[in-house]
Amino acid sequence: MKLCIAEKPSVARDIAAVVGADSRKNGYFEGGGFQVTWTYGHLCTLQEPADYSPAWKFWSIASLPIIPQPFRIKLIDVDSYKNQFSIIEKLIADADEVINCGDAGQEGELIQRWVMHKAKCKC
């Protein structure tokens, strides 16, 4: 099954119509050999400095620059985002191919890459 991940539900609906994914499921569309799902823009963000080290919890000139190795991402703490991410995570695990249908440009690419990374995409 091919999985398309769009950046927003309206784009996912348009893609689903084109590829024949006309069956609406919980958090995605399916049909024609495709599953089409969406993010709500940023589902993930970089972890806060304190998530890396207690020494970085409070700002201090002595702790600058803060450059964690490696940078880590986390889900944004919003229930609807967590729910949609769990749907995406399951779809990615079952997919043969994942197609990045995020918005064109650096930000759209980043949104999709972080979601795929957090979901442990192997495609």
How does the language model describe each region?
Residues M1-C123:
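Intrinsically disordered, low-complexity regulatory segments
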